[in-house]
């Protein structure tokens, strides 16, 4: 007869946290398409409720990942701030009562990207203390990405004339920097033999790439009049966005 070891209280709690995290993630991804359906006729209180429940879900996933490890490291704190910045962005970007709200939402997402960059850099320095913040290949990549974004904006007919063009280009630069740091974090984790290195690479890079895909599509939805009611594009945008947030939340349990 096989003998089974009795699980300790700590092990049971970790298992419970993992189950709860899986259920939360499932709920978020189920709510994502429901949100798109609810706001098909335009933003409303019901669509806002669904969106914010889903957004609270990725915040909860981050908190559960902290509970799994039992430690809230500097990396974890930056990541939680990033998730909270995204939550603020989700809230205000969807409010429609005044034009000030979308601007606050934009700043919320911009701050979230800065927090994620700070988290990645904290993780990188913990594994490779001598690494420079930027290397020349990274600078070249960011510059080329900005050029690509300008070409993309022209080709897709984005209305970025006037003052709005400056913050959008800044945002593109920041999210490209986040993508760079995510890649470096994952590669450094693998190179240094860090625990869960391969999973860190997958979650960090996939999360950042999905974030970029989501931001590209939302720029089309917001600044191209012909695409504002493109339902499949809206679905792609919101699914990639929430998937990105969840993948980034998972990093808290891995680093």
Outline where the language-model segments fall.
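Polytopic alpha-helical membrane-helix bundles and their juxtamembrane interface segments
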Residues: 14-255
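Short, Lys/Arg-enriched N-terminal segments with co-localized hydrophobic residues
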Residues: 1-14
């Amino acid at each position: 007869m096989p003998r089974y070891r009795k699980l300790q209280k700590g092990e049971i709690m970790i298992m419970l946290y993992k189950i709860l995290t899986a259920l939360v993630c499932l709920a978020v991804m189920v709510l994502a398409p429901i949100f798109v359906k609810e706001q098909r006729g335009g933003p409303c209180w019901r669509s806002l409720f669904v969106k914010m429940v889903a957004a609270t879900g990725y915040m909860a996933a981050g908190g559960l990942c902290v509970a799994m490890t039992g430690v809230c490291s500097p990396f974890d704190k930056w990541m939680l701030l990033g998730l909270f910045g995204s939550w603020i962005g989700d809230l205000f970007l969807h409010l429609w009562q005044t034009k000030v709200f979308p601007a606050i939402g934009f700043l919320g997402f911009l701050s979230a990207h800065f927090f994620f960059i700070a988290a990645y850099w904290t993780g990188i320095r913990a594994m490779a203390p001598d690494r420079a913040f930027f290397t020349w290949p990274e600078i070249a990549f960011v510059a080329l990405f900005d050029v690509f974004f300008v070409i993309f904006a022209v080709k897709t007919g984005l209305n970025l004339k006037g003052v709005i063009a400056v913050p959008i280009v800044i945002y593109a630069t920041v999210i490209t920097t986040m993508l760079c740091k995510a890649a470096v974090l994952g590669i450094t984790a693998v190179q240094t033999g860090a625990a869960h290195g391969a999973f860190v690479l997958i979650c960090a890079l996939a999360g950042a790439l999905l974030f970029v895909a989501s931001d590209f599509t939302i720029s089309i939805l917001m600044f191209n009049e012909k695409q504002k009611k493109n339902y499949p594009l809206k679905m792609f945008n919101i699914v990639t966005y929430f998937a990105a947030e969840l993948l980034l939340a998972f990093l808290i349990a891995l680093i």
